[in-house]
Amino acid sequence: MKARLLFLFLFTFSFINTVKGQDLITFKTYDELNTYIKENNSKPLVINFWATWCAPCVKELPYFEKLNQENQNVKVILVSLDFEKQVESKLIPFLKKKKIASTSIYLADKDYNSWLPKIDKNWSGSIPATVIFNQDKKIFVEQDFSNYEELNTFVNQSITK
């Protein structure tokens, strides 16, 4: 029994890295991410797909951080699509340096053709991309936001529809 508990503990925490008091959660498959989304939807979710190598993504991250701090009506989740071998060398140091407080997830599932259509059937796969889950509604945009006001307006309009 002790061995099973130890295995379960080690298995569970082997996918978590600490980032500024916030955990970087790693999901190996989209299905794991989808389960997490379903279990954490007590309020509207604003999910941004991004990567450290994507300049427009990095530019708009402060807007999502501000949204996370100022809009208590939503939960912001940042889903990194960085390259797996750069998680330790680039992603985690980036999150620490920028003091990212939003929920941060690394999605290791590289079978994009299987899960992109589950987010939105028209998603080409380019990032940044944002999806809002609000109860049974889903609103997807494949664009970057020019400023915080544009993002905040989009989110507020989306959650009141």
Ranges and model annotations:
Residues L61-K98, Y112-W115:
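Structural microenvironment flanking redox-active thiols in thiol-disulfide oxidoreductases
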Residues L95-I127:
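Short, internal strand/loop/helix patches
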Residues S126-F140:
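A short, hydrophobic beta-strand/beta-hairpin element that forms part of a small beta-sheet core
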Residues M1-K28, T160-K161:
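Bacterial Sec-dependent N-terminal signal peptides
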Residues F49-Y63:
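Conserved redox-active cysteine motifs that mediate thiol-disulfide chemistry
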Residues P44-L45, P128:
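Alpha/beta-hydrolase fold active-site loops
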Residues V46-I47, V76:
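Hydrophobic beta-strand anchors of alpha/beta hydrolase catalytic cores
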Residues L24-P44:
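A short beta-strand-turn-helix
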